[in-house]
């Protein structure tokens, strides 16, 4: 998992509440267990029209937001069924941070496990970030995870809270396997101790 320290990029405003995981990545993309290639399926029912052409009105199809790294979204983002493909699709598209007032619990946890930072902010702060994001490609936003703050294009800041353990994992790029490897020396030492104490076993 790639480390997450500071992220600077365009923020795309998605002013829709209750975006569920089926909207993020529709069920037809769930057959694969590969994490790559899912970016094409991200919001596919909104990004594409029935004939397969792009919907020019959808935010991520607009020129200013095609390379967005940050998504500013309405309340209750990622609700619905458990679908780890949802953060995979965001990440494969290039989005590493989602900002909202609240998230679906399972989606929220899956984001951390896959290197995507979900940030909860107040409604007032979200409205300010929507205003920043609507400035298009001029709306460069910086996410500073060590400092736990969001910096807008005009220098304004929004502080955010994050669990210290999850912060540690993101900054160091540690997924479940990485966490185990981080403790490898302690695990090896414990196993050696057991072998000595229970040589009969």
Swiss-Prot record:
GO molecular function, one term: 3-isopropylmalate dehydratase activity
Ranges in a coiled coil: none
GO BP term (any one): L-leucine biosynthetic process
Gene3D superfamilies in the record: Aconitase, domain 4
Pathway(s) per entry: Amino-acid biosynthesis; L-leucine biosynthesis; L-leucine from 3-methyl-2-oxobutanoate: step 2/4
Cysteine disulfide links: none
Gene Ontology CC terms: 3-isopropylmalate dehydratase complex
Enzyme Commission identifier(s): 4.2.1.33
Protein name, as recorded: 3-isopropylmalate dehydratase small subunit
Protein species of origin: Rhodopseudomonas palustris (strain HaA2)
Organism lineage: Bacteria, Pseudomonadati, Pseudomonadota, Alphaproteobacteria, Hyphomicrobiales
